[in-house]
Regions:
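A short, N-terminal "cap"/entry segment at the start of jelly-roll beta-barrel domains
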Residues: 10, 26-74, 154-158
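Bacterial N-terminal signal peptides that target proteins for export
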Residues: 2-15
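Short acidic-glycine-tyrosine-enriched beta hairpin
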Residues: 113-128
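Glycine- and acidic-residue-biased ligand/ion/polar-headgroup-sensing regions
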Residues: 94-97, 101-106
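Conserved short histidine dyad/triad with adjacent acidic residue
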Residues: 76-93
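Ligand-binding loop in jelly-roll beta-barrel domains
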Residues: 127-152
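Short beta-strand segments in beta-sandwich/barrel cores
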Residues: 87-88, 104-109
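Bacterial N-terminal signal peptides
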Residues: 13-24
C-alpha cells in the first residue's frame, strides 16, 4: 500500500500530465480557429445621410449605415432618425429584422395590428411579415435596425 506522500506525488504527476495534454489540445484548437484581429470604428456624424422616409414612408429621415463599406460583413447595423411627420412605408420583410427604439415615439403597424413603440421597445419582424412605422409627436423617433444579408459573390481578380 502506498503511503500518503506517494499518493500525493502520483496525483500531482497525473494532474501535470492532464494539464499539459489540455494545453496541447487548446493550442491545436487555437491554431485551427485563428482569425485575424482588428476592429472598425465609425461615428454617426461621419456617415449621416439625409433621406426621405424609406419604402415610400414620406417625410425626412437621417440614415446611418454603420460598417456599410466593410467587406464580408453579413450583419446590417443601422440607426435612423425619423423627423416629425415621417415614416417607413408598409413593406414585406425578406429576412428577420430587429427594431430598437432609442428615443421618441412611434406607431408601428405589424401584419395589420398597430402598436405604440417608445424608448426601450424592441420589435422582431419575421420573414414574410409586413410592417410600417410612423413617427408620433414633436420629437424625432430614433431607432436602431439590425438584420443579416447574404454575402455577395466577388468578381474574380483579373
Amino acid at each position: 500500500m502506498l503511503n500518503a506522500d506517494w499518493r500525493t506525488r502520483i496525483r500531482c504527476a497525473l494532474a501535470a500530465i492532464a494539464f499539459m495534454a489540455a494545453g496541447a489540445g487548446m493550442h491545436a484548437l487555437a491554431q485551427q480557429k485563428a482569425v485575424p484581429g482588428g476592429y472598425v470604428i465609425e461615428h454617426d456624424a461621419d456617415i449621416a445621410v439625409n433621406e426621405p422616409g424609406t419604402h415610400n414612408g414620406g417625410g425626412q429621415t437621417v440614415g446611418y449605415s454603420f460598417f456599410k463599406k466593410v467587406p464580408n460583413l453579413t450583419l446590417v447595423f443601422r440607426k435612423r432618425a425619423l423627423k416629425p411627420g415621417s415614416g417607413i412605408g408598409l413593406h414585406e420583410q425578406k429576412e428577420d429584422e430587429i427594431y430598437y427604439v432609442l428615443s421618441g415615439k412611434g406607431s408601428m403597424t405589424l401584419d395589420g395590428k398597430t402598436v405604440e413603440i417608445t424608448p426601450g421597445t424592441a420589435v422582431l419582424t419575421r420573414t414574410g411579415s409586413s410592417h410600417s412605422l410612423k413617427q408620433v409627436g414633436d420629437e424625432d423617433l430614433v431607432i436602431m435596425i439590425n438584420y443579416e444579408v447574404e454575402l455577395k459573390p466577388t468578381a474574380p481578380a483579373k
